[in-house]
């Protein structure tokens, strides 16, 4: 199986690569469209800022290319947010794969800190990504923006408000949390993605 990780100006690519290596998978980290198109699975990771990253994706033509991929694609954190229609982070149009917007957390109480950083459980598991997953397992989040619960929600969690922890539409899967940093539970999610 050929697994490709999209290389662009965003962080956490190395941690995704390490997580795949722990599962015995040698991924190709590339921005080469032909290599990405030929891969069996594509991972779209990201830690960064939406406006700058979308500008980079548009300049390289990756914005149109990612939407045309037909194999299973997994967006992680910023990767998930960029798959949405619009982000309040920089008020930027995104890829529009998921017809929903990305909003900024608005804390209502002093003890509600932004960014949402740390471990949280997820529920309403409506995707094969979560095969063998139980409600009491924790995954790791680091983000200041969220995607509201919608028809594309494959899992949800609650921090300040309920929001989408994962999305799914056709061949596109996405997690707001970092499976590559979520221990055994995250490893299982990556393994499930690779088995789709």
Swiss-Prot record:
Keywords: Amino-acid biosynthesis, Cytoplasm, Glutamine amidotransferase, Histidine biosynthesis, Hydrolase, Lyase. Pfam families: GATase. It is found in: Cytoplasm. The keyword Translocase does not apply. The keyword Hydrolase applies. One of its GO terms (biological process) is L-histidine biosynthetic process. It catalyses: 5-[(5-phospho-1-deoxy-D-ribulos-1-ylimino)methylamino]-1-(5-phospho-beta-D-ribosyl)imidazole-4-carboxamide + L-glutamine = D-erythro-1-(imidazol-4-yl)glycerol 3-phosphate + 5-amino-1-(5-phospho-beta-D-ribosyl)imidazole-4-carboxamide + L-glutamate + H(+); L-glutamine + H2O = L-glutamate + NH4(+). InterPro entries: Class_I_gatase-like, GATASE, Imidazole-glycPsynth_HisH. Residues 2-196 form the Glutamine amidotransferase type-1 domain. Pathway: Amino-acid biosynthesis; L-histidine biosynthesis; L-histidine from 5-phospho-alpha-D-ribose 1-diphosphate: step 5/9. CDD domains: GATase1_IGP_Synthase. One of its GO terms (cellular component) is cytoplasm. GO terms for molecular function: glutaminase activity; imidazoleglycerol-phosphate synthase activity; lyase activity. The active site is at 77 (nucleophile), 178, 180. Heterodimer of HisH and HisF. IGPS catalyzes the conversion of PRFAR and glutamine to IGP, AICAR and glutamate. The HisH subunit catalyzes the hydrolysis of glutamine to glutamate and ammonia as part of the synthesis of IGP and AICAR. The resulting ammonia molecule is channeled to the active site of HisF. This is Imidazole glycerol phosphate synthase subunit HisH. The gene is hisH.
